[in-house]
């Protein structure tokens, strides 16, 4: 009788403790989706110190993060014709249609995280009608204001994209992130300091094997391997970019878990089918 009673008490104690146990953190899958290619892009524009003659077909990519009822897109690509002509874009599929082809209707995207305001990263924010848009507060403020004043810098920024961002803000769909190392969604954190644009950010997706999605804060694996800066907001920001790359490696726990912004090798290093590579 006593052993049976003890067993019952043990079971009841376990049930009681489990009621107060914290919920398990969300587990996200991560996919890279290639929606276009820019052929024969000068490597020197991507990797400081690269030979002038070297060129690369760069991948145009958005990243899909899914789990716990969330469908999150990191960067949105672009769809304006002028940029296709300027950069001789090939193999193009509009980003929302690239998602649909991967089995994800664009209207199911719950959140969009913008790394920075350049045309090929923020240019598709109007393609995902139900999504909340996350962007750094300082990036929003600069590119809707001082960037267009005398002495401002707005290279690579499309005024139509800025207008779309402002409109979404007036509709209550924009969330402004205030600074570095902020958890915007459970186990998804953003970090600043790489200075690709005025206040560019990158994402860490936590888990047993954390992944850092660098976007243009680190263009290629070659940046990491050669410890070479990506393009920065001003030339004086190069050291900040290198420090950020080191931080990305530390945050990911290994250099191989840092995913660069435009490297076609991510579709060779990870299992891939068509336009989609499974990062995790």
Locate predicted features.
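Metallo-beta-lactamase
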Residues: 2, 7-11, 18-104, 108-120, 138-192, ...
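Cap/insert and terminal regions of metallo-dependent hydrolase folds
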Residues: 89-92, 200-280
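Active-site metal-binding loops of divalent metal-dependent hydrolases
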Residues: 35-36, 76-79, 117, 138-139, ...
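Hydrophobic/aromatic beta-strand patches that form the interior of the parallel beta-sheet core
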Residues: 31-33, 113, 134, 175-177, ...
């Amino acid at each position: 009788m006593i052993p049976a009673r003890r067993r019952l008490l043990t079971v009841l104690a376990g049930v009681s403790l489990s009621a107060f146990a914290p919920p398990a953190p969300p587990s996200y899958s991560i996919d890279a989706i290639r929606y276009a290619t820019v052929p024969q892009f000068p490597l020197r524009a991507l990797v400081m110190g690269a030979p002038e003659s070297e060129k690369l077909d760069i991948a145009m990519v958005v990243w899909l993060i899914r789990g716990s009822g969330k469908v999150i897109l990191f960067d949105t690509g672009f769809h304006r014709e002028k940029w296709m002509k300027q950069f001789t874009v090939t193999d193009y599929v509009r980003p929302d249609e690239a998602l649909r082809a991967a089995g994800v209707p664009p209207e199911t995207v719950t959140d969009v995280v913008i790394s920075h305001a350049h045309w090929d990263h923020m240019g598709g924010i109007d393609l995902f009608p139900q999504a909340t848009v996350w962007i750094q507060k300082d990036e929003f403020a600069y590119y809707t204001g001082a960037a267009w004043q005398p002495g401002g810098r707005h290279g690579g920024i499309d005024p139509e994209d800025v207008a779309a961002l402002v409109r979404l803000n007036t509709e209550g769909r924009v969330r402004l992130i205030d600074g570095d190392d902020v958890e915007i969604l459970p186990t998804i954190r953003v970090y600043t300091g790489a200075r690709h644009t005025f206040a560019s950010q990158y994402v860490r997706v936590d888990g047993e094997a954390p992944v850092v999605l660098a976007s243009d804060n680190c263009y290629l694996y070659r940046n990491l391997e050669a410890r070479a800066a990506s393009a920065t907001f001003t030339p004086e920001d190069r050291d900040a970019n290198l420090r950020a790359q080191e931080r990305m490696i530390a945050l990911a726990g290994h250099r191989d878990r840092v995913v660069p912004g435009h490297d076609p090798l991510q579709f060779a290093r990870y299992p891939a089918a068509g336009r989609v590579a499974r990062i995790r």
